[in-house]
Design a protein with these regions (language model features):
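Structural preference for solvent-exposed beta-strand-turn elements
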Residues: 12-168
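Single conserved hydrophobic/aromatic residue that forms the stacking wall/gate
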Residues: 1-11
C-alpha cells in the first residue's frame, strides 16, 4: 500500500507534449532499453517531469541515455517509469501534430490524445538504476565528424557476432 501511494504521488497532475517531441526522444532511448529482460525495470523508461521539460532515461546497466523535451500545461513534477517499447509504439501511432496528455492514476500511466485513451502499467521510479557520474575533470570535447572518423578507423577490429559486448 505504501509503495502504491508513493507512485500515485510521483506525478500528481499532468502534462502535455507534442507527438513529434516524445517520439523523437523515445526513439533515441530505445537503442539502450534492455531487450533480454533480465530485470523488468530495464525494459522501462524513467520519466521525469519538471516545470518546462520531460526527461526520459533508459539503461541496460552498461549504457545510459537521457533525452530532454519541452512540455506544455505543466501542473506539477515528479517521476515514474513505463514500458519503453509500448509507449513508443503507442505514441508513434497517434496522428501527426497531436498533443498528448499524460497523467498518473494509481499504478497506471494514462495517455490521452483526441478521442483515444490508453493505459500503461508503471513500476516504481526508485527501482530504476541510474548511473552516478563523477566530476567531469577528465572530460574532453570532440566534434561529431572527428568522432565518426575515429570510429571508422578502428571499426575493423570489432567482432561481428561476439557475445562479449565489452569487446565491441
Amino acid at each position: 500500500a505504501k509503495d502504491r501511494r508513493q507512485r500515485q504521488m510521483c506525478i500528481r497532475d499532468s502534462f502535455y507534449i507534442l507527438k513529434e517531441e516524445i517520439v523523437k526522444s523515445l526513439n533515441l532511448t530505445l537503442g539502450v532499453v534492455e531487450k533480454r529482460q533480465t530485470l523488468p525495470i530495464l525494459s522501462n523508461v524513467l520519466i521525469e517531469v519538471d516545470e518546462s521539460s520531460l526527461k526520459l532515461t533508459a539503461t541496460d546497466l552498461e549504457s545510459e541515455i537521457s533525452t530532454t523535451s519541452t512540455i506544455s500545461n505543466f501542473n506539477s513534477g515528479g517521476k515514474t517509469t513505463a514500458p519503453a517499447r509500448k509507449l513508443s509504439d503507442l505514441c508513434r501511432l497517434l496522428p501527426d501534430m497531436a498533443e498528448i496528455h499524460f497523467f498518473l492514476d494509481g499504478d497506471n500511466l494514462k495517455i490521452e490524445s483526441g478521442s483515444g485513451k490508453y493505459n500503461l502499467s508503471t513500476l516504481p521510479s526508485d527501482d530504476f538504476p541510474v548511473f552516478e557520474f563523477e566530476d567531469s575533470q577528465g572530460q574532453i570535447n570532440i566534434s561529431s565528424e572527428n568522432l565518426k572518423t575515429i570510429i571508422m578507423k578502428t571499426s575493423f577490429a570489432m567482432g561481428n557476432q561476439d557475445w562479449r559486448h565489452y569487446l565491441n
